[in-house]
Design a protein with these regions (language model features):
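Solvent-exposed, charged/polar functional surfaces in cytosolic regulatory/catalytic domains
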Residues: 3, 7, 21, 25, ...
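Hydrophobic alpha-helical segments that form the core
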Residues: 37-43, 87-106, 122-125
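Amphipathic alpha-helical packing segments from all-alpha helical-bundle domains
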Residues: 13, 17, 36, 53-79, ...
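Short helix-capping/turn signature of helix-turn-helix
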Residues: 43-51
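Hydrophobic alpha-helical connector segments
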Residues: 2-38, 89, 93-96
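Amphipathic C-terminal alpha-helical segment
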Residues: 25-29, 50-51, 96-113, 126-133
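Short, solvent-exposed positions on alpha-helices
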Residues: 13, 57, 87, 113-117
Length: 134
């Protein structure tokens, strides 16, 4: 992930690349196991993190790192004028990450990789959303 989120790549390209990497990993797992496996971190977390504190801590760290990667790309995209101003980049990063995780969970439940086809486009749409007025 460090390579994908390196500042040598344009920020919106980083978001596209991570989505492509996720889809690629899911396709490889499907070819090997005959099933969509979804995100190993979230799958494991959903199963055992409520009763295994040490594991829960590790899972939280992994999720937080993923959010920081997304947030750095969003902040860079905003500072370069590639996306509208974001009042709360950390929240936007969590939304984008949750979108990816939701797609992976749906793909796993349905055992259908095509669910992931919209991931990169959806993350780009989330990145480009303007502020929500109240």
């Amino acid at each position: 992930m460090d390579h994908i989120f390196s500042p040598i790549h344009p920020p919106l390209e980083r978001l596209r690349m991570v989505c492509e990497k996720i889809v690629e990993e899911q396709r490889e797992a499907y070819e090997e196991h005959g099933r969509v496996l979804g995100c190993p971190v979230h799958s494991l977390g959903a199963e055992v993190s409520t009763w295994e504190e040490a594991l829960q801590t590790k899972i939280k760290e992994a999720i937080a790192q993923h959010h920081r990667y997304f947030e750095s790309a969003l902040r860079d995209a905003e500072s370069q004028g590639l996306i509208p101003p974001i009042p709360d980049p950390a929240t936007r990063a969590r939304i984008a990450s949750a979108y990816c995780e939701g797609l992976m969970m749906h793909a796993r439940i349905l055992n259908d990789l095509s669910v992931l086809d919209a991931m990169a486009e959806g993350v780009q749409m989330i990145a480009r959303m303007g502020p929500v007025s109240s």
